[in-house]
């Protein structure tokens, strides 16, 4: 900043642990306020809340203008419900739309699951499509998800607030064109 004779930047911080901790503090002080403190986490940065049902391309359009304002770092993402290689044309459409909208750092999240018993890698819902076993059989499936732009290990290592946020994420259908 010329006015302060200092370098000033703005970071769209993920504040992953703060998203739950600050919420708990605010609940203690202000109680549960509908639409503010009634979930298990705060939406971080300038993201559209993960539970808002809107087309992926619209989400990108809403978040993109903030990338130009956060010169110290930013990310926007689209969450998919399956394997993006099943619809590469739609995947490319999202990537191109991110670029055209001005997204500086974009991510397309999708599930990566592994059955540690039979070694299957792919999308696992309630039962492994390879061997047919379920989580209830005693050894849980490894469910790797992206947080703050990184694959950070299995969900069981995430804090409660971030697990709740991941559970609430609107998953856009891989077999769609992601809407306009």
Label every PLM stretch briefly.
Residues 1-180:
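Long, C-terminal-biased catalytic regions of enzyme "large/alpha" subunits
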């Amino acid at each position: 900043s010329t006015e302060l004779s200092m370098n000033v930047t703005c970071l769209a911080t993920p504040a992953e642990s703060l998203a739950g901790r600050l919420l708990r503090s605010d609940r203690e002080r202000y109680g549960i306020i509908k639409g503010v403190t009634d979930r298990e986490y705060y939406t971080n940065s300038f993201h559209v809340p993960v539970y808002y049902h809107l087309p992926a391309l619209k989400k990108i359009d809403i978040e993109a203008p903030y990338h130009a304002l956060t010169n110290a770092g930013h990310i926007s993402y689209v969450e998919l419900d399956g394997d993006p290689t099943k619809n590469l044309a739609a995947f490319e459409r999202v990537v191109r739309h991110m670029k055209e909208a001005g997204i500086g750092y974009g991510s397309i999240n999708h599930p990566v699951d592994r059955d540690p018993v039979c070694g299957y890698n792919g999308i696992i819902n309630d039962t492994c499509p390879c061997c047919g076993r379920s989580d209830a059989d005693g050894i849980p499936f490894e469910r790797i998800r992206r947080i703050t732009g990184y694959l950070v290990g299995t969900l069981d290592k995430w804090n409660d607030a971030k697990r709740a946020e991941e559970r609430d994420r609107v998953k856009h259908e891989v077999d769609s064109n992601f809407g306009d």
